[in-house]
Every structure is written in structure tokens, then in C-alpha cells.
């Protein structure tokens, strides 16, 4: 059975925010960044445990994983059964303590 990728509303909102931010500089660049984030997430269909266990989110009831895309963004996700839930796209330039309080 193929793994499904499910984007949470929060992750989709963040994706929109990233696009809007970069669009002010260049719509072409914004599109490229969002497309890379989206296509990177698709690799999780084949390799759902490809990301590292996210140490800043240790202690939550689910095992959050992450991997870096586009130098400054982490896809934060967890695997449950045949589904990968992308819960956030985290800008790694932010204060890491904020990540612990997002869920």
C-alpha cells in the first residue's frame, strides 16, 4: 500500500506565507521555493522515515521527524500507519524555542 502525504492546515498556511513573503521579491523565486518544498515532501511517500527524529519535539505523543529543504526550511512531520502528516514548515532562522510551543 502506498503511503499518503497529508498536509495539515497549519503547514499549508505556512506554505502560503512563505510564498507571499518571497513573492514580494520575486514571484519566480517564490514559486521555485514552494515547489521544492512540495516536491521534497513527495519523497516521503517512498521513504517516510527519511527525516531525523526532531530533538526539539521530543516528548510529544507522536515521533516528529524533520529534514531540511532549501537551506532554511525544515519539513516537520510524523508517520502514522500508511500516512505521513506534514505539520509545519519551520524556518530554521527562527528561535528554536518557538518550535517546541507550536503544537
Spans of features found by a protein language model:
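Basic/aromatic recognition patch in beta-strand/loop cores that engages polyanionic ligands
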Residues: 49-81
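Short proline/glycine- and basic residue-enriched helix-capping loop/turn segments at helix->loop/beta transitions
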Residues: 45
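Enriched for short, Lys/Arg-rich terminal
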Residues: 69, 73-103
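Hydrophobic alpha-helical segments of small multi-pass membrane proteins
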Residues: 36-39, 65
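Solvent-exposed interaction patches of small proteins and small membrane subunits
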Residues: 25, 29-32, 36, 52-56, ...
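Arg/Lys-rich, positively charged N-terminal/basic patches that mediate binding to nucleic acids
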Residues: 1-36
Amino acid at each position: 500500500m502506498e503511503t499518503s502525504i497529508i498536509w495539515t492546515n497549519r503547514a499549508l498556511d505556512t506554505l502560503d506565507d512563505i510564498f507571499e513573503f518571497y513573492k514580494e521579491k520575486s514571484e519566480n523565486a517564490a514559486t521555485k521555493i514552494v515547489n521544492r518544498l512540495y516536491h521534497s515532501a513527495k519523497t516521503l511517500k517512498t521513504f517516510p522515515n527519511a527525516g531525523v527524529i526532531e530533538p526539539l519535539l521530543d516528548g510529544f505523543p507522536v515521533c516528529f521527524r524533520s529534514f531540511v529543504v532549501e537551506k532554511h526550511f525544515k519539513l516537520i512531520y510524523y508517520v502514522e500507519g500508511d500516512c505521513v502528516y506534514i505539520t509545519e514548515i519551520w524556518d530554521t532562522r527562527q528561535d528554536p524555542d518557538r518550535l517546541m510551543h507550536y503544537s
